[in-house]
Amino acid sequence: MNCSGVLALFLSSLLIPFSTMASFYDPVDGKFDMGHHIAENVTGFLPIPILITEPAVGYGGGVAGLFLHESAEEKRIRKEAALKAIDGGAQLVPSAMSVVGALGTENETWFVFGGHRRSWLNDSIRYTGGGGFGVANIDLYKQFSLGNKELNLKFGTSTSVAGLSQKVQFRIGDTPWMIGLKQLFAKSKVESDNRLVDKLMEFTLGTESVTSGLGIEAEFDTRNNLFYPTKGYRFSADYMVFDEVIGSDSNYRNLNIEGEGYIPVSEKWTLGLAGNYQNYEQGDGFVSPTAKPYVELRGVSSFRYQGDEVETLQGQLSYSINHRWKVSGFYGSGKATERADQSNKVNAGGVGFRYQIARRYGLHLGMDYAQSHEERAIYFNIGSGF
């Protein structure tokens, strides 16, 4: 049994009677599996240990619980499919799921969160929402020119925030396309350990600020599994407007385009590709320093490379040892560009593994090790890692 399986089993044993331990083994292959427990128990859920080595916040951890809500008929269909084939049931998307969790790190960053996704009419209408509150202590970087020299200013920030994000989507006929509306609302307070920066933010943003945004989104999705796809594509584009008219203290716009694809190279090998482009337009002279988009790659600190334009490209090659175990190698490149023609590029790569912990749902849990030229980190992931 793998280490993630042992940890998940231990956490689960604290919540359920010992007599139900047999439900943690798959009836088809006899391996450790939590699919039966999630589906057949009223309080069944997947406990997800959170191991944090994010360079931006330091070492830490937490725990999350993933609840998959299905009707009796949906459970019956999934169970029958899982008993007939090794990959049976994994292509069926649960009509509703929820997640709750909490985490904390050594630099006193902490967060409590929850989310829910629900679909109706055979996934013709879909709602996704989530919220949380906590404190994030992170370093931010600002690049500027002084004469012929390019200088980087580093300053610590502490952001206390409570926020809500939600969206509703509607399917276009029987196609893989969905269109919808998005909303984001957050109330935050940002402080800095740099006295000059702190006074500047207090003067321009006030002691507290409200972020309120509305937007539109289009999404195309043909992936064969929501959690760990091995075939198919996903493309999405959204445009968010943050404006005083809808209650925001800051005025800015953000365009976000992202895509990912999974190409079976052979029976054992799968090639994954992912890309992201963001374009940020600032209407006010001053906004919260965390509002700008940043390069998001495994092995790179969050908010380390921010810009008005952000581009990332990633590739991942996965090998299936068997239907339970997967190993992978990945590499990515990112670029953050400011309006003043200043840009930063960063490359990062690493290796990882996954264990299929709930076969009838296609849920994979595992770890990634990644590093860039100046940082390294370990990630405890559920899903592909993109």
Predicted regions: what they are:
Residues 44-46, 60, 109-111, 159-163, ...:
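Transmembrane beta-barrel architecture of outer-membrane proteins
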Residues 45-47, 96-100, 125-129, 177-181, ...:
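Transmembrane beta-strands of outer-membrane beta-barrel proteins
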Residues 269, 340-348, 356-386:
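Predominantly the C-terminal beta-signal and adjacent terminal strand-loop region
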Residues 54-56, 70-72, 121-123, 173-175, ...:
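Outer-membrane beta-barrel channels and translocator barrels
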Residues 207, 214-321:
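C-terminal outer-membrane beta-barrel translocator/porin domains of Gram-negative envelope proteins
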Residues 70-72, 103-107, 134-138, 186-190, ...:
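Sequence/structural signature of outer-membrane beta-barrel proteins
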Residues 17-19:
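N-terminal signal peptide c-region/cleavage motif recognized by signal peptidases
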Residues 38-45, 51-206, 291, 307, ...:
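Gram-negative/organellar outer-membrane beta-barrel architecture
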